[in-house]
Regions:
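Glycine-centered loop/turn motif at secondary-structure junctions
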Residues: 99, 147, 200-202
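Conserved acetyl-CoA-binding loop-helix of GNAT-fold acetyltransferases
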Residues: 139, 145-161
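Active-site-adjacent loop/helix micro-motif of nuclease/hydrolase catalytic cores
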Residues: 111-115, 144-149
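N-terminal amphipathic/basic-hydrophobic helices that include classical n-h-c signal peptides
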Residues: 1-27
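Terminal substrate-recognition subdomain of acyl/acetyltransferases
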Residues: 18-70, 164-250
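Short amphipathic alpha-helical segments and helix-helix/interface helices
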Residues: 77-78, 153, 193
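Short, histidine-centered active-site or binding-site loop motifs used for metal coordination
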Residues: 136-138, 172-173
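A conserved beta-strand-loop-helix scaffold within acyl/acetyltransferase catalytic domains
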Residues: 69-132, 137
Length: 250
């Protein structure tokens, strides 16, 4: 029985390796050496590519890890990989996803969707959607501390499509892994800010209620090279619903 199971396991691994090698022709990949061995950064892949991969241990939902969460996440990544308005990049090791970053369109009827519409109304030459959101960036617990999140963000934004976009990231402290890192909320916030700044994001002031709920929460944004300065100015104005007044208006 053990020999049969081992043989099946070898055939499964060989099949996965063959499938991945076939999909290499349509996937943008970059090999990266780490202290734990070589990994592959991948993006612009199909749903079938995801199906050939397992989920790394310690990769769940936000800072929680349960098998069912990892399994659910794999299904989500598989489905969104086929969406034209969604961008996904992964860190792959030994045919398993050990990290990923997901960029999505703003939710319908949200404040960010309204800002997207306002930007398109003022600058109709911009492609819809012009505003995107970094929905999630996760790294498997054993693969943290290797600089992979920084490398993955840089790899994602090598895609020139983002030079025509504004990408926001809403950082909410209830999603942070404070327990395992031992960091205070403000220290974790600083760590995240440095991470996003390395990929071209900037800190932005906003009166958004969800972000303002906790002092350590923050909003950052990355402006593509092809976004007009006037559109950047309008974006910043739209981050506050308070009436804009000039000097001397009180």
């Amino acid at each position: 029985m053990r020999r049969g199971a081992a043989a099946i396991g070898r055939r499964h691994a060989a099949a996965a390796k063959f499938a991945l090698s076939w999909y290499h022709i349509i996937v943008i990949e970059k090999k990266l050496k780490t202290k734990k061995g070589e990994v592959i950064l991948a993006r612009d892949f199909t749903e079938e590519y995801i199906r050939c991969l397992g989920m790394g241990e310690g990769l769940g939902v936000f800072f929680h890890y349960r098998y069912q969460d990892a399994h659910k996440t794999r299904k989500i990544l598989s489905s969104v990989s086929e969406s034209g308005d969604t961008k996904l990049a992964c860190v792959v090791s030994a045919n398993c996803i050990v990290g990923y970053v997901l960029i999505v369109s703003p939710e319908a009827d949200s404040r960010w969707s309204e800002i997207n519409d306002a930007l398109l109304g003022g600058f109709p030459a911009l492609a819809d959607p012009v505003l995107l959101e970094l929905g999630s960036i996760e790294m498997s617990t054993p693969w943290r501390g290797l600089g992979l999140s920084r490398e993955l963000l840089r790899f994602m934004f090598e895609d020139r499509i983002f030079e025509e976009k504004i990408v926001i990231s809403r950082e909410l402290s209830w999603t942070w892994d404070l327990r395992s890192t031992g960091l205070t909320p403000l220290a974790y916030r600083g760590k995240l800010l440095r991470l996003f700044e390395s990929a071209g994001f900037r800190y932005c002031d906003t009166d958004d209620n969800e972000i303002g709920y906790a002092g350590e929460n923050m909003l950052t944004a990355r402006f593509g090279e092809k976004i007009p300065p006037e559109a950047v100015f309008l974006f910043h104005r739209l981050l506050s619903k308070r009436e804009q007044r000039g000097w001397g208006w009180g």
